[in-house]
Amino acid sequence: MTIPQETLDQLTHVPMPKHVATRQPNEMLQLGADIIPVYRSEALVIGSGAAGLRAAVELRRRHIDVLVATQTLFWGTSACSGSDKQTLHTAATSKQGDNFIKLAQALGAGGAMDADTAYVEAVGSVEAFAGLKYIGLPLPEDRYGAILRYQTDHDEAGRATSCGPRTSRLMVKVLAEEAIRLGVAFVDHSTVIRLLVAGEGRERKIAGAIAINSGDRGENNPTGLAIYLCPSLVLAAGGPGELFRDSVYPKRCFGSLGLGLEAGITAVNLTEHQFGIGTRRDEFPWNLSGTYVQCMPYIYSVDDKGNEHNFLAEYYRTTQELAANIFRKGYQWPIHATRMLDFGSSLVDLAIFSESQSGRTILMDFNRNPQPVAGDESFSLERLEPDVASYLSNNDALLPLPIDRLRRMNPLAIELYKYHGQDISQSPLAFNVNHQHMNGGLAVDTWGQTSLSGCYAIGEAAGTHGVTRPGGAALNAGQVFGLRCAKQIANQTASPPLAVAQLHKQIAQCMADITQGLSNENGLNLQQIKADIQQRMSDKAGFICYADEVSDALQAAQQLNQVIQQQGIAIPYVNKVAVSFQWRHMALASEALLTALDFYISQGGGSRGARAICSAQGEAVPESRQGPLADYRFITEKPEHRQQQLTVTYQQGKFAVTVSSLRQLDDLNAIFFEKNWPDFLTGALYR
C-alpha cells in the first residue's frame, strides 16, 4: 500500500506551537547598579523537551503554579533528534499483554540499575503511554485497537512502538499544545547558569536558580541576569551533548549534569553510555538504526584520492555473514563490547572506527547491495541468514535493492533526509560512530528527587538507566518520572516563601564571576576549552578506550578545572556569558566522568555496554577474517560489578567516588488494597 505524501509530510515536517503564556517578574532586586528581575513560582522546570513538558503539564493539572525556563522553546534533543523509527518502549498492549516484573528485569538486564527504579518505569509506562495517546500522539494501532509493536535493542519481547522518525518531536508537540491549553507559563531564551541552595549539611535544599535571560537585558541589567525562586525545581535540560566531539546530539545541548554537579548533587553511572552509527553532527545528526541498516545498504569508505574500499569484507568471513550483521545493527544498534567477538554486529562499528581513524570517509549507499567478500559469492536474497530472511519476508521486503527494501519498510526514513537536504535514493550518506546517549546522570530516588532536597532530575539529566537499556526506554523513563515528580511535588507541604535577601551572597558571587570574566584578558578561551574537552573525551573515553590512557586523561581534565578556577574564563561579549558557564559545567562533567571511569578501571572493571576497555592484559580479542585484532584486545566484565553503582559527588573542589549496592524492590506480595489505600488517601506514599 502506498502511503500518501501528505501523511509522510505530517510525520516528518512537525511544526511547533509558537504562542505561549509568558510570565512577568514578581519583583525587582537592586544589587549595586544592576536591577535584576526575580521570578517566583511553586515549581520551576528547566527545559522544554518531552520530559520537562510532561512534568510541567502534570504539575499544572495538579494546580501547581509552575514556570518553565528554557534555553530555546521546544528545541533540543527531544525535538531535534531521532532514528528511522524512533522508539517508545512501554509495557506491551498487543496479543498476550505483558508482565511488569519481566519488563523491569529487561530494563535492568545489563546490570547497575536499581530494581525499584526499573519496576517504577515498567508500571508507570502504562499511565505515561495512555496520557500521550489521550492528548494526540499518533501511536499506530491494529484494527482491534492494539498498539503495533516490534523488536528493538536489548528487547527480546518486542515491546517497541513508534510514530516514525520523529516520535519524540511529536511528543514535544502534543505536550506543548497541552501545556498551552493549561496556561503553563514559559520564559524563553533563559539559560540557567547556577542553582541556588538554602541551608547547610543535611538541611540543604533547593531555593531556586540564577539564569541569563536575553529578554531581561537592558540598561540596568546588561547581562540579562535573572533570579528564579522556588521550593521545587525540576532539571529536565537533557544530557551533556557537547561533551564529545563525535556526537549525534543537536548542537548547543549542554544538559544539566555539570549544573547539578557544581551544586554538590550526587551523580551515578557516569561510565555508562550509548555509542552507535549516525550521520555526522556538522550536517544532519541522526541515528542510523532500524530499517536504515535492516535494508542492508552497501557500507564502504573513500580515501583522500577518491578510491573506494569495501572494508567490511576484510572483517567478515562470507558475504552472507557480512550482510546479516549490517542487518542486525537495526535492533543491536548500540555498540556492545561482547558483540565485537565471534563476528558479531558490533564488529561493524569496530571496523568503521578503525577505517575512520585512517582518515577515510565512511558512506552508506542505498542503491547498491553489500559487495562480496573476496573469494565468496555475490550478495543474494536467496542466501540470507534465517533471521534476516524471516524479517524481510514478514514485511514483504524481499526486493532487489536496499532503497526498494527501505521504501517498502519505512518510507518516512527516506522523507526525513530529503526534508533535510539529502536524497538518499540518489546519493550515498556519510556517517560515523558517535556518542548518542548518557545512561548515567544525576542520581534520583523513585520519585525523581536528587540528593539535594526539592531538586528533581528527569529525562537524560537523571541517571536512572544501567549498563544497557532497551531502545525507547529513555523516552519512557522521562515520561514516567515527569509524572512521578509532579505527583510528589503536588503532595508536599507548602514551604514559606524565601526572602531573596537570604541568597544575596550566592547571587553576588555569581555576578562577580561574570564581571571578572568580562574583563579577563588572561582567562581561558572558550573555543580552546571546547576543543580540549571534546577531543579528550572522544579520543580517550570513547567506545574504544585504552585502560592505560584514562589516568592521564583524568589528570588533564583536573588541570583544566584548576586553571579555570585560578585564571577564569575570558568572556569576549555580554552575549557569551551564558555559554561561558555552560563550558565551565562541561569541564566539571568531563572530570566527573573520567574520575568514575578511572576508578572503575582501577577496580578491575571490564568492557560492557558502551565501552571496550582495551589492554594488553585483556582476556578477549575480536577477530576478523584476516586474524586476531590484537590492538583491540579488551578486559572482560566482572559479573559482580553488575550489582554495583559508582556514585560521584563534587565537594570542596574535588570529586569523590563511592561504590553503592543496587536498591532492591520491596516484597510486592505484602501490598494489599485495604492496608495500602490509606497511604494513597493521606498522601503518605509520597513522603
Language model regions located:
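Extreme N-terminal leader/targeting segments of oxidoreductases
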Residues: 1-43, 61, 163, 204
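Conserved redox-cofactor binding core of oxidoreductases
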Residues: 20, 128-224, 236, 279-291, ...
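Core beta-strand elements of the Rossmann-like FAD/NAD(P) dinucleotide-binding domain
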Residues: 38-41, 220-232, 451
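Glycine-rich FAD pyrophosphate-binding loop
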Residues: 61-82
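Glycine-rich loop(s) and the adjacent beta-strand/alpha-helix scaffold that form part
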Residues: 229-287, 472-488
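An anion/pyrophosphate-binding glycine-rich loop and adjacent beta-alpha core
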Residues: 266-412, 488
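Long, amphipathic alpha-helical stalk/connector segments used for oligomerization, subunit docking
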Residues: 494-577
